[in-house]
Amino acid sequence: IKLSYPSYDTLADLTSSISSAVAREVIEAYGDASGWAMANPVGTGPYRLKEWRRGQKIVLEANPTYREVPYPVSDDPADRALMAKMKGRRLPLIGRIEVNIIEEANPRLLAFEQGALDYLEVPVDLVANVLEPNNTLKPRFKAANVALHRGIQPGITFTWFNMEDPVVGGYTKEKIALRREIGMAYNVDEEAKVIRQGQAEWASQLIPPGVSGHDPSFIGNTKYDPAAAKALLDRYGYVDRNGDGWRDLPDGRPLVLKKGTSPSALERQYDELWSRNLKDVGIKIEFVTQKWPDLLKMARLGQLQMWQLGNRSTSTEGYGFLGLLYGPNAGLGNLARFRQADFDRLYDESKRLPDGPERAKLMRRMSEIFFGYTPWKLNAYRYENMIVYPWVEGYKLNVFNIHPWPYLDIDTKTARKPVQ
């Protein structure tokens, strides 16, 4: 692979869980006009496709020609028992994997409880069925010796503002103040506690924990503070000029926010929280309701004013988040259409540096610029909860790869006692 310029994060991308080598002959034989071979997945990994029923089931079997890869060695004291059992074994450990595609959350959890699934990512809307308020397993799961693996996802949730929108966009002081006020008016702690059922926490900075560029000493995000939000609005002329109970723009025109949303019960909860919080500071908000793919099309065309999204990294590099604000990505990953010359220059410079203090300094400066202009309201870091039956061997939570199939095995001697 020959790069057009030094890009040290490329190695992390190539070694992430979503990257794999594909033989040139496969692309030549099965590739479509875009060079993809999605209908004929032939890779070079530890498993090969045995059976595929679209939208229902995937069966993988161990690749007999896979290169010799031993189980990785760990010096972590917490892994001693794991190392004693797995050290030196060749990957993949298990010969067959069945992936059952169950779209609805309730049937997924039921399948796990009945022992039809060996492990499960706990559906966010069913966390209360599995965990106690202190985030420990409920007694019936403990009785079945189910293990809980929990950690913060390498991701963020945020609400972006269209920087080209005549109401919320722009780089002047009063526009920055409006976006910052909207952020202070929104109660992320309530979102995390009520809507996300305690499975999230307020995000202090743009790059989440566990990812390069995260600085534990840096706090850039604003906290929920409706009183300060009101004062900031008053200071920059966002006041009620006609006595209708809603604030207006400094030039006297009505101030109305329009946020994208999807027609689901979960999205309605977010909409209600936004409506209630903004009403408390005198701002009117309306919702543009469309299916998610249609909202994405509108966003890429610059037709949405605001929209709430999430982003998750598959590698240890923080550029997956910074790239969402990089000017040349406007209309693609950069849905806010944020363009700031200093940010873009620092982004280009930092990409040419290896991970270290010099690059970390540039990434922190980019974060400071981001919070200075507030093209997003940064919301939360989310938690991952994986529940695993005792007959599954080798499971260790890796938030960058929550399905580590080659490293897992099944202990056939352990009695299968599902959740009652």
Cite the ranges covered by each PLM segment.
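Catalytic beta-strand/loop signature of glycosyltransferases that borders the donor
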Residues: 382
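Extracytoplasmic/periplasmic solute-binding protein
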Residues: 204
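Active-site-proximal polar cores
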Residues: 379
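Membrane-interface helix-loop-helix junctions at transmembrane boundaries of multi-pass membrane enzymes
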Residues: 19-20
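Extracytoplasmic/periplasmic ligand-capture domains
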Residues: 2, 6-14, 26, 35-38, ...
